Structures are given as structure tokens and as C-alpha cells.
């Protein structure tokens, strides 16, 4: 199985060979719960997201990725931040691609659908905000969710 390995400020990390604009989406339901997926490629919990395709806006990509990975339809409602730390690289073992992080974190409200796992997610669930800290996730996802929970959408993170 193909894996994703995240490296943070690691001198032994492979050098990045690509930069792919991507989106992540904090989707919230009427109860205030956050939509989370368990990633198939590293078994960590994360918000849905993925690469922006050519000819697609970031909002369109966010809605598409959320639907593909979770079965949930959503409407984009805000921006939390832009994450582009060159010290964070992601190795994809299937093809040797090493990406420098470049992700835009958006907020959204759920508008329909049922949580449904996909080939990219082994589990999909609504998580109460107060339970997020107990979920296993990589450092950059924890940082992003921390910014969301702190209410950064009024003052986006740029880093």
C-alpha cells in the first residue's frame, strides 16, 4: 500500500521535488461538530482535502474533495490560513514524489450527505470540538485545527 510520510524540520528528510496547491476544509454541522477522516495512507485523522485541479477554483476543489472523501456536501464559509512551510515535506511512497507543503485551510458548513468512507479515508465521522485533541493526527493538521478553534478566520494565518 502506498504511504504518505510527513517530515518536519528534519535534516534527514528528502528534498522536495514538487509543490502542489491544495485545500483542506473544516466542515461543521448544525451541532457544531467537525467532519474528520481517518486517512488511508497514514492512518492519521485529518479534515478532508486534496490537490486543486487545473481549471478549478480553491472553493470548487474544497467542495469536490470533501464530497469525494466523505460523502458530505458543503458550502465554503471562510478562510483560516495558508500553510507553506518549506521545512514540512510530504513523501508519497507510491511514486517518490516529495511535496513542499502548500495548503489553504477553508471553513465550510455541511449542506447534505451522509458520512461515507472512500479509497482515501478508512473512517469518516463528526467529532465534537472538545474531543479533537484526543485524535491521532500529524503536527501540521493539529496546528491547522488549533488555528480554526482559536477563531483565526477573522485574521488568517500566513506561514
Question: Would you name each region that the model predicts?
Answer:
Residues 85-114:
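Active-site-adjacent beta-strand/loop module that shapes the phosphate/pyrophosphate-binding cleft
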